[in-house]
């Protein structure tokens, strides 16, 4: 393909992305854009970033051959990129460290974040403790109930957790509240956005920080199997773990990229969180233009997923663009399929995956039998499932 060079100076990925925010936030975003442009060209910043990833996060995360599961499926070989092994248990820490270092450079003493599953909240609270910053995390009240272990973790790490009671009480509402806080406290506060969405420059800088995932696997897979995988696959909510896996492969011919959205109770039911694969129209949410789940009047519709981290009505603008140009494809996996993959991964590989990651695992398990035994699917195992055991137990009628 032609050289891939996105976003443009205005933060557009084709027709998606951009900056659709209140005037009060423009100054903060311009400031962030200028600082990030400086940082991007500064090798000392990246040296510090990679030093932290190695010595604090424990990178590089390994690639792992899921042999027993692959054998049982009888087709393609399934490999995992083990982001679950990072400090704090998910890919979120890569982005949180990058943004916290940026905040420190900008002299900000207070950081805020939104969180769904709680993983980004934990990652933000972690880096705030690491760098001595005040931390406030906004979390939908519904998610606070679903993810009580992560709420307690954030508090242990010194963060203030604010339950958001408005709207559907999930991730989008937490994001709204975080943006309100930022508008009010823009001079002292840095907003550590948790996914590759939101207004420019967030989709770009988040992507740059999480691209370490695909950059590593691009080196690791040839060492492990002598070549690149046939398919790379990742779950997509806002889309940060997926863009971190995909971006380094965009210009690599022959590597298929598949993003797996949350099919909830099935796309036909309307109770899902799959804006791209369900053919949702384009709209603006949280400062950015993307495919967006909305009704005929343009009102955001309530989403559903068994996984709190995928329960979001929009998606990062770069994914919309990759879909439109045909470089990546997007599919959905429903709650039941994801839960089945969750249990299979536990039983066959001794790894408890996050429910988010289980969507990507389920798609891999679904297609592997129809592929050749010499073909390879690399799944971004974006996080571990300790945080989800209450949810999974509850669905099985078990009280912990």
UniProtKB/Swiss-Prot annotation:
Cofactor section: pyridoxal 5'-phosphate
Keywords noted in UniProt: Amino-acid biosynthesis, Aromatic amino acid biosynthesis, Lyase, Pyridoxal phosphate, Tryptophan biosynthesis
Its job: The beta subunit is responsible for the synthesis of L-tryptophan from indole and L-serine.
Domain of life: Bacteria
Gene Ontology cellular component terms for the protein in this record: cytoplasm
Stated family: Belongs to the TrpB family.
Pathway annotation from the record: Amino-acid biosynthesis; L-tryptophan biosynthesis; L-tryptophan from chorismate: step 5/5
MF terms (GO), sorted A to Z: tryptophan synthase activity
Record InterPro entries: Trp_synth_b_CS, Trp_synth_beta, Trp_synth_beta/beta-like, TrpB-like_PALP, TrpB-like_PALP_sf
EC number: 4.2.1.20
Protein name: Tryptophan synthase beta chain
Residues modified as N6-(pyridoxal phosphate)lysine: 92
Assembly and oligomerization: Tetramer of two alpha and two beta chains.
CDD domains linked: Trp-synth_B
Catalysed reaction equations from the record: (1S,2R)-1-C-(indol-3-yl)glycerol 3-phosphate + L-serine = D-glyceraldehyde 3-phosphate + L-tryptophan + H2O
Organism: Chromobacterium violaceum (strain ATCC 12472 / DSM 30191 / JCM 1249 / CCUG 213 / NBRC 12614 / NCIMB 9131 / NCTC 9757 / MK)
Classification via SUPFAM superfamilies: Tryptophan synthase beta subunit-like PLP-dependent enzymes
